[in-house]
């Protein structure tokens, strides 16, 4: 039925399936792990092939406009109603959900050192630490910025998030996401997006892992409009990859965790819920290699706005104002003439949480390191430090390529509140604001 199907890799209780992918961004995909598992010309036949159950997973209201209507039909061994046992509260650890007021919101620019990986075994669910929250998950608005620290795979466990969509940004170590839609492998330089309500587990594929995690409480991430840029560049739809179907038919006791209403709930099932044999639709997890992003920029003079580096946007109800923008600062050429080339000094209506995947960020060559983070909340000034300013103001303006660097930003319309962990863990750099103390008065009315 589908040229991307790899049935020879699928088996009962398969645990080591090689991931396969379909190209495109939120296409109407179809994929089956067994031939004939997908019904033809209908969604819900009287009897599904192989004794499967038909189930729809909706990521938008039924009446959403066609361009933003998201749903998939799943053909699975057991319907999800069989995945609901008697839930009990589980330890949510350091994962926090907005609104979270456990610490006051400081009027200051903030920067953190990378959190160290623990020496003990810690799975994904145990290793999420929240740095900031914004908005209100109950009203489906805002976001949270987390860091994950993983030293052990999830075994006989599954999880889904009812509160929001999850974007993983690996910084160290590679991960395998075993989802009910299929398998996804990803490492530093890639992102993975898991929609709200999709069951999955996280496995290590090569040593401990650390990275960033954006929890999007609002509308789903989508590609930004290009406007006058035209039909090409930025993130191209063909570079997004969605997994082909892969299932588990395992009668092994499995813990199912659900994040719902800011609380983590758990139940035990007598089988694996990762049991989708075939599916079709446009609501599915995907990954994207950030190194395929084609940046645009100034080829004459001046420094354009950072919005030109937007990879994905989660829009709000106000046109042009994002609930979240995911922005990257990748390798690129700097060629603008008679121009201060680093990001300029700025006060912004949006609130910016930044991280560094690898390399050096051109506006902050010192102190902002891979695995670390910074927060510049709305209307708090920020910009290059003294070293970056002096170098950019006096250096030779020859074409220069920034290489080996990948920084990113989660930008939201809502102020971001720091958590107790972010404020008191010892990672907060107390002298961050000192990076601007060396910026002295340069004004001389006698020298134009």
UniProtKB/Swiss-Prot annotation:
The active site is at 303 (proton acceptor). One of its GO terms (molecular function) is homogentisate 1,2-dioxygenase activity. Pathway: Amino-acid degradation; L-phenylalanine degradation; acetoacetate and fumarate from L-phenylalanine: step 4/6. Its cofactor is Fe cation. It comes from the Bacteria. Keywords: Dioxygenase, Iron, Metal-binding, Oxidoreductase, Phenylalanine catabolism, Tyrosine catabolism. GO terms for biological process: L-phenylalanine catabolic process; tyrosine catabolic process. It catalyses: homogentisate + O2 = 4-maleylacetoacetate + H(+). The keyword Ribosomal protein does not apply. Fe cation binds at residues 346, 352, 382. One of its GO terms (cellular component) is cytoplasm. Its EC number is 1.13.11.5. The keyword Membrane does not apply. It is an enzyme of class 1 (oxidoreductase). Homogentisate binds at residues 361, 382. Hexamer; dimer of trimers. Involved in the catabolism of homogentisate (2,5-dihydroxyphenylacetate or 2,5-OH-PhAc), a central intermediate in the degradation of phenylalanine and tyrosine. Catalyzes the oxidative ring cleavage of the aromatic ring of homogentisate to yield maleylacetoacetate. Belongs to the homogentisate dioxygenase family. This is Homogentisate 1,2-dioxygenase. It comes from Rhodopseudomonas palustris (strain BisA53). The gene is hmgA.
């Amino acid at each position: 039925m589908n040229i991307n199907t790899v049935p020879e890799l699928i088996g009962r209780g398969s645990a080591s399936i090689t991931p396969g992918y379909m190209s495109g961004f939120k296409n109407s995909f179809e994929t089956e792990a067994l031939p004939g598992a997908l019904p033809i010309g209908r969604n819900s036949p009287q009897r599904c092939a192989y004794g499967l159950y038909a189930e729809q997973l909706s990521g938008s209201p039924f009446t959403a406009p066609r361009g933003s209507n998201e749903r998939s039909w799943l053909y699975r061994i057991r319907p999800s109603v069989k995945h609901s046992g008697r839930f009990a509260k589980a330890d949510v650890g350091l994962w926090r959900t907005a609104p979270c007021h456990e610490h006051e919101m400081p009027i200051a620019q903030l920067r953190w050192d990378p959190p160290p990986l623990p020496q003990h075994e810690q799975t994904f669910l145990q290793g999420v630490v929240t740095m900031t929250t914004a908005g209100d998950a109950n009203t489906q608005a805002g976001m949270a910025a987390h860091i994950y620290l993983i030293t052990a795979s999830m075994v006989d466990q599954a999880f889904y998030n009812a509160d929001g969509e999850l974007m993983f940004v690996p910084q160290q170590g590679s991960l395998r996401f075993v989802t009910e839609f299929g398998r996804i492998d990803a490492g530093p330089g890639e992102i993975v997006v898991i929609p709200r309500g999709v069951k999955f587990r996280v496995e290590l594929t090569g040593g401990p892992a650390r990275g960033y995690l954006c929890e999007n409480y609002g509308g789903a991430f989508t590609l930004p409009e290009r406007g006058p840029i035209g039909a090409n560049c930025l993130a191209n739809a063909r570079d997004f990859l969605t997994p082909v179907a892969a299932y588990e038919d395992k009668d092994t006791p499995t813990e199912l965790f659900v994040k719902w209403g800011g609380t983590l709930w758990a139940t035990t099932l007598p089988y694996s819920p990762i049991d989708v044999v075939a599916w079709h639709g446009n609501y599915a997890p995907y990954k994207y290699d950030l190194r395929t992003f084609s940046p645009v920029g100034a080829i004459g003079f001046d420094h354009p706005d950072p919005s030109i580096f937007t990879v994905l946007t989660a829009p709000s109800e106000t046109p042009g104002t994002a609930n979240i923008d995911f922005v990257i600062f990748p390798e690129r050429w700097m060629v603008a003439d008679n121009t201060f080339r680093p990001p300029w000094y700025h006060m912004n209506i949006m609130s910016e949480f930044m991280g560094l995947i690898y390399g050096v960020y051109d506006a902050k060559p010192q102190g902002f390191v891979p695995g670390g983070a910074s927060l510049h909340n709305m209307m708090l000034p920020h910009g290059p430090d003294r070293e970056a300013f002096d170098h950019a103001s006096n250096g030779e303006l020859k074409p220069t390529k920034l290489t080996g660097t990948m920084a990113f930003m989660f930008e939201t319309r809502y102020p971001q509140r720091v958590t107790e962990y972010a404020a008191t863990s010892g990672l907060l750099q107390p002298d961050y604001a000192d990076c601007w103390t060396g910026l002295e008065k340069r004004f001389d009315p006698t020298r134009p």
